[in-house]
């Protein structure tokens, strides 16, 4: 039996609960658990200087795309950059897109070319 993307339950999101982003500083990633603890969306980053992070990659499983999950990951990562007084290099195309759509001064002033 084939499973379609629409048939995948969304767990807490489906029940109207807010999306909860977790930050694992040791692994340098932000995650959202999607279906209990089995599926997750992730944003990966690395320190590339003393106070510079590279926001490298955002991945949301196909079945969960288009539901605003990546936006929550991007916001959490950029808020982390602001709160920790860091600079950010945006390797990830999605985060580049997010900043263009949300050109907040506190984000823009922290971007590295």
Curated annotation (Swiss-Prot):
InterPro entries: Acyl_CoA_acyltransferase, Gcn5-rel_NAT, GNAT_YJDJ. Pfam families: Acetyltransf_CG (PF14542). Residues 22-112 form the N-acetyltransferase domain. Transmembrane segments: none annotated. It comes from the Eukaryota. PANTHER family: PROTEIN NATD1. Belongs to the NATD1 family. This is Protein NATD1. It comes from Homo sapiens. The lineage of its organism: Eukaryota, Metazoa, Chordata, Craniata, Vertebrata.
């Amino acid at each position: 039996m084939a499973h379609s993307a629409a048939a995948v339950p969304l767990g807490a999101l489906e029940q109207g609960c807010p999306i909860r982003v977790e930050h694992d500083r040791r692994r340098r990633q932000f995650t959202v658990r999607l279906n209990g603890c089995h599926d997750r969306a992730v944003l990966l980053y690395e320190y590339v200087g003393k106070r510079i992070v590279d926001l490298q990659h955002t991945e949301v499983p196909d079945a969960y795309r288009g539901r605003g999950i990546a936006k929550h990951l991007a916001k959490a990562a950029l808020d982390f950059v602001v709160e920790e007084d860091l600079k950010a290099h945006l390797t990830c195309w999605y985060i580049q897109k997010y900043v263009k759509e949300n050109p907040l001064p506190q984000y823009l002033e922290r971007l590295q070319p």
